[in-house]
Design a protein with these regions (language model features):
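Alpha/beta-hydrolase fold catalytic core
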Residues: 1-56, 80-81, 307-313
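Conserved HGGG/HGGXW glycine-rich cap/lid loop of the alpha/beta-hydrolase fold
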Residues: 50-96
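Flexible "cap/lid" loop of the alpha/beta hydrolase fold
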Residues: 143, 151-186
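Conserved alpha/beta-hydrolase catalytic His-Asp/Glu region
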Residues: 164-166, 184-244
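Short beta-strand/loop motif that positions the catalytic acidic residue
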Residues: 246, 252-254, 258
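Short alpha-helix in the alpha/beta-hydrolase fold that links the catalytic acid
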Residues: 248, 262-271
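Catalytic active-site module of serine/aspartate enzymes centered on a nucleophile-bearing elbow/loop
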Residues: 276-313
Length: 313
């Protein structure tokens, strides 16, 4: 529910969802970023700039886009990194070609990212940060292509130790029958469930604004996006207990009050992979999207992990 949470914070009663999306893209352009679409088996879309600074790969969460999730992070890191902001398959401008395609997996997403990196000419290993579903993509990318990843930073990520039973219990606590029902969001009013789960504080949202967000950022993509979650559910027995073969340094960032993917899940990932305690940080007064709720606090933690001398796995 990332894009929905972001828009809930960013839009006021006099704004339109489409206007906000365009404003975000204009800010990226002002910082020197350009949009790239590569036609392989369909459009693979990414924002990127190349000023000679180290590249940093940022992967958005479920329902998000690279621009919507990461524009604040990109601005705060503008003097240090040239960020790579892809739209994952079934999201944003990487979704136009596959609106009816189903069964996309984390491996498909990882291949999509490699296609983009190759197309941009980024061959050296880069640090990758992945939030929520994007955390799962980043985790699999680092496992499949360790030669392309310098370090892995999982941020409130859907990586392992998260079962359908746990997800459904969280959904029921917020008045929904199941997590799949929350993510399916067949009506604009259903977006409220996802927003409550994503944010530390619930913003007051008028119905007309929910309808705008739904029409612009949810309805066109939901049929394809829901297949991403169904793929994870189909492989739940492996996914929940998976111990990744990571050969790069791994760090974890979590929102202190993340109700969507709780801290306990992050701690379980830390312990399952025997990661150092110093590679785990929680950000106070944040939920599932700390980089949106407290962007400066998030970047301070991220910067410390990006510049740290890691304890090798």
């Amino acid at each position: 529910m990332l894009a929905l949470a972001l828009l809930a914070l960013a839009l006021s009663s006099c704004n339109l969802a489409r206007m906000h999306g365009r404003a975000v893209e204009r800010r990226l352009v002002r910082h020197g970023y350009t949009a790239h679409t590569y036609q392989a088996d369909g459009p693979h879309f990414v924002w990127y700039r190349n000023t000679g600074k180290p590249p940093l790969l940022l992967l958005h969460g479920y329902t998000g886009t690279g621009a919507l999730q990461w524009h604040k992070t990109t601005a705060l890191l503008s003097k240090e990194f040239d960020c790579i902001l892809p739209d994952l398959l079934s999201h944003g401008r990487s979704a136009k070609w596959d609106s009816t395609r189903s069964g996309l997996s984390l491996d498909d997403q990882a291949a999509h990212i490699i296609t983009l990196l190759d197309s941009l000419g980024v061959r050296a290993a880069v640090p990758v940060v992945g939030n929520s579903y994007g955390g799962g993509v980043a985790a699999r990318l680092a496992e499949l292509h360790p030669e392309r990843i310098e370090r892995l930073i999982i941020y409130d990520g859907l990586v392992s130790d998260y079962s359908t039973a746990l997800a459904d219990s969280i959904a029921r606590a917020h008045g929904a029958p199941s997590m799949l029902a929350v993510m399916r969001t067949p009506t604009a009013n259903d977006l409220r469930f996802g927003i409550r789960l994503s944010l530390y504080k619930d913003p007051p949202l008028p119905g007309f604004l929910l309808k705008q967000v739904y029409r612009e950022f949810a309805a066109p993509y939901r049929a394809s996006q829901i297949t991403l979650l169904k793929d994870l559910m189909a492989h739940e027995s492996t996914f929940v207990h998976k111990r990744y073969d990571w050969r790069v340094p791994v760090y974890l960032i979590w929102g202190e009050r993340d109700e969507l993917i709780p801290n306990a899940t992050g701690r379980a990932i830390l312990e399952r992979h025997a990661l150092p305690e110093t590679h785990w940080v929680t950000i106070p007064r944040t939920g599932h999207v700390a980089n949106i709720e407290r962007p400066k606090a998030f970047v301070a933690v991220l910067r410390s992990f990006l510049t740290a001398s890691p304890i090798e796995p």
